[in-house]
Curated annotation (Swiss-Prot):
The gene is atpC. Disulfide bonds: none annotated. It comes from Pseudomonas fluorescens (strain SBW25). F-type ATPases have 2 components, CF(1) - the catalytic core - and CF(0) - the membrane proton channel. CF(1) has five subunits: alpha(3), beta(3), gamma(1), delta(1), epsilon(1). CF(0) has three main subunits: a, b and c. Pfam families: ATP-synt_DE, ATP-synt_DE_N. One of its GO terms (cellular component) is plasma membrane. Its main location: membrane. Keywords: ATP synthesis, Cell inner membrane, Cell membrane, CF(1), Hydrogen ion transport, Ion transport, Membrane, Transport. It is a peripheral membrane protein. CDD domains: F1-ATPase_delta (cd12152). NCBIfam families: ATP_synt_epsi, PRK00571.1-4. Produces ATP from ADP in the presence of a proton gradient across the membrane. This is ATP synthase epsilon chain. InterPro entries: ATP_F1_dsu/esu_C_sf, ATP_synth_F1_dsu/esu, ATP_synth_F1_dsu/esu_N, ATP_synth_F1_esu_C, ATPsynth_dsu/esu_N.
Length: 138
């Protein structure tokens, strides 16, 4: 049996996952992170994208987060997400439409244009599509 660590994924809406996992893979601001038992303690911010959990027995479960923080302590990993969804609950058509709308907003800058808000919307929609692509690869 593989070594496990306790993982919690929570957002403002509440806890979406709590259990033992063999591995947590997340997209940190400085690159991808793979967290397993015995990982050094750390705290880092997370980019929008998938969080992949490898549960006991090798079963994988994927979640989408819109950003947040990851804390690693001995025997514990905690993901504090801005928002979180199970990857299977994402709507690909809505994500593609959001990408198109954000790209259109970036190309049609008006007087009251907020570049950073449009860029954030584009990054989140693109991250949702990446998450959907990742679960298709399973």
């Amino acid at each position: 049996m593989a070594m496990t660590v306790h993982c919690d994924i929570v957002s403002a809406e509440g806890e979406i996952f709590s259990g033992l996992v063999e591995m947590v893979i997340a997209h940190g601001d400085l690159g991808d992170l793979g967290i397993a038992m015995g990982h050094a303690p750390l705290i880092t911010s997370l980019k929008p994208g998938p969080i992949t959990l490898t549960k006991q027995g090798g079963e994988k479960e994927v979640f989408y987060i819109s950003g947040g923080f990851l804390e690693v302590q001995p025997n514990m990993v905690k993901v504090l997400a801005d928002t979180v969804q199970r990857a299977g609950d994402l709507d690909e058509a809505s994500a593609q439409e959001a990408v198109k709308a954000a790209e259109k907003a970036l190309n049609e800058k008006g007087a009251d244009f907020d570049y950073s808000a449009a860029a954030v919307r584009l990054a989140e929609a693109a991250a949702q599509l990446r998450t959907l692509q990742q679960i298709r690869k399973k």
